Amino acid sequence: MGPTMRMTQVLSVNDLSPHMKRIILTGESLSDFPDDKESAHVKAIFPNPNLSDKKPKLGLYFGFKMFMRPYTVRSFDKQNLALTIDFAVNDHQGLATNWALEAKAGDYLGIAGPGDVKHLDINAKQHLFFGDITALPAIAATLEKLPENAIGHAYIQIPDKQDKQTLITPKGINIHWLVTPNKLTEDFLDGLKSQSNHLHDTAIFIAAEASVVKQLKSHLDNNCEYDKSTLYASAYWNQKR
C-alpha cells in the first residue's frame, strides 16, 4: 500500500524571490492531512505535459514515478485546508520547474504523503543546518519550531542576494547566507570546520547536491564525534543527472 494521494488545486502563487515561488494548494482532499508536518516531505504529482488533460493521474500505474517530485511542507492551515509549498526554480527546464513557473489559480496538482519531519531533535543542545536553496523551505519551517532558547548556526546557499528571506528564528541561531551561483560551494565545509569536533547533543541537518552532502558527511565521520540518531543528511538533487 502506497502513500495517500490527494488531488488539490492551486489557490495562489507568489514570487518570494527570483528563485523561489510560494504556491498554496487547497481542496477537500486535505481534510485528513495531518498537522505538525512542517518540514516533512510530500511527493508532488504533476500532470503529463504531453497530454491535453491538465489534471495529474493519481495511482500506482506503470511509470507513475516519472511524474512525481519531492517537496517540503512549508506550512498547513487545517482550518482553511491550505497547504503551502515553496518551489525553488532555476534555469533548468524540467517537469516541476516548468509547472511552477506557469502555475496559476485553479491548476491541479496531486500530493502524496506526507513523510516524516526532517530535523530529528528540536530540543537538542545545539543545532546546525547546511542547505542550498532547495533546502531553504525545510530549514525555514524547522527554525520556526525551535524553542526560544535554541542555539546554533544555519548555513544557507542562495544563487542571488535577492533570494534572502526573513526567517523567524530564535535569537541564538546565527544565519549565514552564502551568496554564490555555484551550488557546489566549499563554504558549507568551511562552516562545519569552524565548529567544535565534539558535536554530542547537536542536531545536524544537511540537504544539498549529492556530492556536497557526501563531503560534509565524510568530514563528520572522519573528524567529529556526533550522534547519528540526530543527523538528517539527504541529497536533494544530483548534478550528474
Task: Enumerate the language-model features and the residues they cover.
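Extended, composition-driven regions rather than compact fold-specific motifs
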Residues: 1-241
